[in-house]
């Protein structure tokens, strides 16, 4: 599915104004203004803001196997899928460390939604250590080529540019006195070993500006 189609789906399904655009480099950029609806359906600390999952789902209407990483008490009614959390009491599909994901069959998923702790203070609220973002991205390299990772954070995680392409960067703001966050959409690339020789010679997966981002 091309990004022009994804943006059309977003506008059609959400009814929001067109706020995402395809830049000259082929990457999607834009802003989501979430408004002053402070509700988090689960009442769980750090839960997704109202309407976030609906927006993401509208961008990926064809995805059938979603995985919620750092899932907490994610609203599966808004976005069905399996869950991963290190806290067993939350009853996730997989009790696992997001930095290794050893128990998760990542190759069976075509979309991963990640919302890690943003700071040491946030991690303390969850009674966990601060996550190493580059380790999470390394574990996600086991995804099948073409799978997407939707990463909500205040930081762009380090990643390998031969493993992932940045398809979209979306600024997200709720209202005054709230943290400004960024939604980064990664696409898993095929490795050289997975590409036929002809495809390898013609490979155009990497955006021209991708070299501007650091690798893990």
Briefly describe each language-model feature range:
Residues 111-138:
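Mobile active-site "lid"/loop adjacent to the S-adenosyl-L-methionine
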Residues 1-77:
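S-adenosyl-L-methionine
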Residues 132-185:
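Conserved Class I SAM-dependent methyltransferase catalytic core
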Residues 175-216:
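Core SAM-dependent methyltransferase catalytic element
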Residues 76-77, 122, 159-160:
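Glycine/Thr-rich phosphate-binding loops of Rossmann-like dinucleotide-binding domains
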Residues 99-113:
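A short acidic, Gly/Pro-enriched loop at the edge of an enzyme's catalytic core
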Residues 64-101:
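SAM cofactor-binding core of SAM-dependent methyltransferases
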Residues 72, 118-119, 155-159:
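Short "lid" loop at the C-terminus of a central beta-strand within the Rossmann-like core
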């Amino acid at each position: 599915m091309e990004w022009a189609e994804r943006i059309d789906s977003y506008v059609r399904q959400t009814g929001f104004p067109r706020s995402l655009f395809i830049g000259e480099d082929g990457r999607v950029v834009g802003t989501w203004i979430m408004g002053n609806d402070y509700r988090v359906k689960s009442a769980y600390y750090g839960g997704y803001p109202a309407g976030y999952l609906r927006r993401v789902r509208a961008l990926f209407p064809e995805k059938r196997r979603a995985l919620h990483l750092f899932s907490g008490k994610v609203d599966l009614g808004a976005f069905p899928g399996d869950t991963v959390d290190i806290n067993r009491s939350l009853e996730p599909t997989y009790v696992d460390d997001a930095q290794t994901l050893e128990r998760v069959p990542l190759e069976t998923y075509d979309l991963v939604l990640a919302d890690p702790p943003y700071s040491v203070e946030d991690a303390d609220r969850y009674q966990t250590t601060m996550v190493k973002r580059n380790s999470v991205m390394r574990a996600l390299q086991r995804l099948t080529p073409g799978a997407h990772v939707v990463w909500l954070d205040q930081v762009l995680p380090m990643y390998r540019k031969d493993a992932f392409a940045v398809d979209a960067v979306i600024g997200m703001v709720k209202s005054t006195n709230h943290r400004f966050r960024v939604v980064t959409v990664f696409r898993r690339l095929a490795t050289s070993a997975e590409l036929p020789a002809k495809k390898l010679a013609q490979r155009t997966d990497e955006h021209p500006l991708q070299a501007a981002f650091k690798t893990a």
